[in-house]
């Protein structure tokens, strides 16, 4: 098995991996190029530059400014809408259900870094999947951190930072941080 296969497999499995690996950097560069092509000339026809990267897509609208790390670890259901300048860092799977709305500047991060500075200097990273169930609305500027599941029908308020699971049919915001 090649080193890239091991690094990619480790990354997706949530194990430590070398984020400075040349082949992973090449995959990220390809995704950035696809995003740049779409963002330079946003249209339904040009959105294919991004969605063809995705592991699976039901139906999606991606407003300009969309960015992703790899794309290949993103799955979206039907009626997915990402408002302007959304960022999905998909070192691990990001699985998004049907009828999900992301406000502008929503960021979803699967990547994380060790607390040890020496490991960080060496490019050690790890990633955990993010799951967003059906009928979720995430308000503008919210940040979803690695390993989080947001339950069906939940609402995440604007500018919230979500570091723990959100139960189904609850609201989580800066004003109401307790489910």
Which residues make up each language-model segment?
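Terminal amphipathic alpha-helical/low-complexity segments used for targeting or macromolecular assembly
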Residues: 1-59
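C-terminal end-helix/capping segment
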Residues: 162, 166-179
């Amino acid at each position: 098995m090649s080193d890239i296969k091991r690094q990619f497999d480790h990354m997706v499995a949530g194990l430590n991996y070398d984020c400075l690996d040349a082949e992973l950097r090449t995959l990220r560069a390809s995704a950035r190029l696809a995003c740049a092509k779409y963002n330079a000339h946003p249209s339904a026809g040009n959105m294919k530059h991004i969605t063809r990267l995705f592991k699976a897509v039901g139906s999606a609208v991606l407003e300009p400014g969309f960015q992703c790390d790899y794309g290949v670890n993103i799955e979206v259901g039907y009626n997915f809408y990402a408002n302007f300048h959304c960022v999905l860092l998909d070192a691990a799977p990001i699985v998004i259900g049907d009828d999900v709305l992301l406000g502008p500047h929503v960021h979803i991060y699967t990547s994380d870094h060790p607390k040890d500075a020496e490991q960080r200097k060496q490019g050690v990273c790890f990633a955990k999947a993010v799951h967003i169930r059906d009928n979720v609305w995430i308000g503008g500027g919210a940040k979803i951190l690695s390993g989080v599941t947001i339950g069906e029908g939940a609402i995440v308020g604007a500018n919230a930072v979500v570091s723990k699971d959100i139960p189904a049919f609850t609201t989580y915001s800066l004003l109401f941080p307790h489910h």
